[in-house]
A protein has these predicted regions:
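Multi-pass alpha-helical transporter architecture, strongest
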Residues: 1-5, 181-213
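Helix-to-loop junctions at the C-terminal end of transmembrane segments
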Residues: 73-85, 169
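Structural signature of the two symmetry-related core transmembrane helices
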Residues: 88-103, 181
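Hydrophobic core of transmembrane alpha-helices in multi-pass small-molecule transporters
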Residues: 111-125
């Protein structure tokens, strides 16, 4: 206990909550990820239950299957991200999610809907690439404060979007998933700005922005 109480981190984290401009890609991807995930968490289950009369207890079982698959695939996803890089990993995720969300909008088969539900969750596992991208570009002293802000940003979308899309759902449930596909498409475009080798001073592929984004 004495050793633990005297432990000091090598890096002193900044306590003020400040989001630096050079982390703007990370911030936007985090915000979009929060909204995208809520469409899956809330409305994919609604689709199974309301459109296909899928028993609620079976939805719970699918959630457990997803958890088991995630546990098994997580190390493999991590190795894949290390091998192909964050931009390619996120590209794979977002292209997959666009296909899944568009398919949700028009699916007529319960078997296909269940397969989409499982694929949807697995693609979200690749979102860890957003965090590894941030770790590569961040000043170590900024990590704690910026992570706290990103948590808040993620949850702003998580709180606001389900309420708004709930109204859309009543009118046309397909529109909800097409909006989700649009969000995934925006994320796809944004992820293309991630460099092959992200690091401090090389946070984006945009030209002539390195100096301004340092602020």
């Amino acid at each position: 206990f004495t050793a633990l109480s005297n432990f000091e981190d090598d890096v002193v984290q900044k306590k003020e909550l400040l989001m630096r401009k050079r982390y703007w890609i990370y911030s936007l991807l985090t915000f979009l990820a929060g909204g995208r995930r809520q469409i899956f968490v809330v409305f994919a289950g609604f689709l199974l239950v309301e459109k296909f009369n899928f028993p609620f207890e079976n939805v719970v079982m699918l959630t457990r299957v997803n958890a088991a698959l995630t546990f098994w695939l997580a190390p493999k996803i991590g190795r894949l991200i290390s091998f192909i890089g964050e931009r390619r990993a996120l590209t794979l995720e977002y292209v997959g999610l666009i296909i899944v969300f568009v398919s949700y909008a028009f699916v007529e088969s319960i078997a296909v809907a269940i397969a989409l539900y499982l694929l949807d969750h697995l693609f979200f596992g690749m979102a860890i690439a957003i965090k590894t991208y941030f770790q590569k570009i961040a000043d170590p002293v900024d990590i704690a404060a910026t992570s706290s802000i990103s948590f808040t940003i993620n949850h702003i979308a998580a709180v606001v979007l389900p309420a708004l899309l709930g109204i859309v759902w009543v009118i046309n449930h397909s529109a909800v998933f097409l909006i989700g596909a649009g969000i995934a498409a925006c994320s796809l475009l944004l992820s293309q700005l991630i460099p092959n080798d992200p690091r401090p001073s090389l946070e984006t592929r945009l030209l002539n922005t390195s100096t301004t984004l340092q602020q």
